[in-house]
Structures are given as C-alpha cells and as structure tokens.
Amino acid sequence: FKMYMTYPAMMIGDQDMFCALQELKKYGGIAGVHCENAGVIDALIAAHKAAGQTAPSSHPECRPNPLEAEAVAHLLRITEVAGVPIVIVHLSTKEALLEVMRARARGQQVYVETCPHYLLLDDSVYYQEDYSAAARFICAPPMRKKEDQEVLWKALANGTIQTVSTDHCSFTLQQKDAGRGDFTKIPGGLPGVETRGELLYTCLLYTSPSPRD
C-alpha cells in the first residue's frame, strides 16, 4: 500500500491517512509513504513560474531538503499515535534520515527505502545547458547534494536504510521533452528496473563511497 503526501490529485490528508493506517493495522498491513510538504512546494513553484524561472534547475529549488524532512517528521508523529510500522519510500536527504533515527530512538518501527539515482546522481544534472538532458532527470524527490549521497551510502552500509528500489517510471525522452519551457509539465520519474542490480553491484565493488569503506 502506498500513500502520497504530495501531488494534489493523489495526496492523502492527515485524517484519511490515520484512518487508513488504523485499518491496515487490523490486518497486519504496512504502508509506504512518499514524504514531501505539498503546500510549500506548490507555493515555491508558483513563485518560480511568476518570476519566469521555468527551467529544470527550478525543480530541485522548489523541493528543498527541509520539505522532505518536515514531511517525514510529520508522518512519523502520526504513525506514533497510530501505533503502526511504516516504510519511508525513496528517501533522499540527510535531514529526513535524521528524523527516522529520532523516531527509532523513541521506539518506533520505521523502514527506509532509497533509490539508485539518489546514491549515484546529484543535483548538478538539473543545471545542464541542454534542456532535454536536464529534463530527463526530473523526479520527486529530486536529486540532492553530494553530501546527501555520502550519508545515504553510510546509512545503507550500517543498516539504517534497508531497501534500494527503483521507483521505476518508464517515460521516453520524447515524453520528457513534452514539458519543454515549463519544468512542471515534464513527466516525473526515471526508469530503473533493468539497471538497479548492475549499478549497485558495480558501485559496491569498484567505486567509493561504498559500504566497504
């Protein structure tokens, strides 16, 4: 079961989320939740568009690290009251990971998933001069800073992060180009099913940082 705290057409409010978690609890189910603060993201997007800032570089600027961390903290307080375990899906920031560690210190059962692109790519991909090249990396949460990558690798090594999944979205390059001129119209997501295993195997064996370090 997956829930979203962002995307207006898909997001779930606190009351509905709490009730859904209580229902899952009856049957031993567990939910995975996409954590970003939708309201502030929408306000930042509106400000960027009003200023004519519509390039892919605006994408990470409208979804900064604190908005993921705030949503994770918010969710974890709800699950604390609900008394249920939870999965944080595609976690991408050091700040969000800190909120997970705080919840675990309170005795909560929290699982964490990240993705290969958060381990291997950083936000420089959005600042390429070639619009199409930058657009292909639009996803949410966006790629983060190198320091976030380092924290994620260490967390994967010590078991703080349990799962690496793909969040696979198989948009073509032509579909990505459909949003030319407005980053909010670029379909969000990256493919990853075919490459996850190879990427992780290669990086764990031959590159640094890795869990072996």
Residue ranges and their predicted role:
Residues F183-E198:
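Gly/Ser/Thr-rich active-site loops/lids in small-molecule metabolic enzymes
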Residues R77, Y201-L205:
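Short glycine/serine- and small hydrophobic-enriched flexible loop segments
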Residues T114, T166, T195, T207:
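Ser/Thr-centric signal marking residues that sit
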Residues K2-Y4, A9-V164, R180:
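Histidine/acidic residue-rich metal-binding segments in metalloenzymes
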Residues Y206-D213:
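Conserved small/polar residues in nucleotide/adenosyl-binding loops
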Residues D167, L200:
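Conserved, mostly hydrophobic/aromatic
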